[in-house]
């Protein structure tokens, strides 16, 4: 039997949570504070020369940023573990289980998972080509490229664990899990999809990243709403992030071939739409 969408199941009504606004704020603070604390610890461990006399404030700031940039995926990996531990503690405080609190134990069907993987790969290629095709202001593009390049640190195992596994898991637990459910206590499920996407986009470091992350958050929120499960969202997000490495290879070999790029752009849009339609079809309640 197909999964029933949230608005028909009435999940938020059957599993009420107290103070949804407070819960959303705590979740956002948990993620930001964990990253801040880990970043500070990394700087302390790797920035011994910061304490040398004669260094100006500007030089110290630049060195701190360089250290955080070089260890970005380590920061994401460690702070992700802390965030998950924080969610586990929040569940205990609310006298719930981790699975029930985050929604990760809600099952889904294998075809939906396969479609989510396909959608993640297609969305990665389509979104990246679309971003490159739009004439954004140069400063906006430079800040985006600088921030995104920090996710490739020359430590492939750590980069993979952080970008492809930890980040999708943590962000889905937070935004399509706890925060989405909390929003459903306040607004209809469709509006909750939009609001969680806005919050998701706001956590990214540059304006261009915020814009496209917000749009991706809408798609992930739609999948969450339709499937009533986090697993399609986690797999889709993981495939999206992992495909960025595949796109780098594609861009290196075919980036100058406009006909190939155009074909991949159209094909990825078709696969994305077809996959989302398949997810919608597979999660429509049968008469």
Language model features: what each stretch is:
Residues 32-40, 197, 201-202, 208-266:
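Functionally important transmembrane alpha-helices
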Residues 170-195, 222-229:
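Membrane-interface helix/loop boundary segments of multi-pass membrane proteins
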Residues 30, 34, 78, 82, ...:
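Hydrophobic alpha-helical transmembrane segments of multipass integral membrane proteins
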Residues 1-101, 110, 242-287:
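N-terminal, membrane-interfacial amphipathic/helix-forming hydrophobic leader that caps
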Residues 51-57, 64-69, 98-167, 181, ...:
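Juxtamembrane helix-loop-helix connectors linking adjacent transmembrane helices
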Residues 79-83, 159-163, 212-217, 268-272:
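Hydrophobic core segments of transmembrane alpha-helices in multi-pass, intramembrane catalytic enzymes
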Residues 21-26, 77, 110-118, 157, ...:
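Hydrophobic alpha-helical transmembrane segments
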Residues 32, 36, 40, 121, ...:
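Transmembrane alpha-helix boundary/anchor motif
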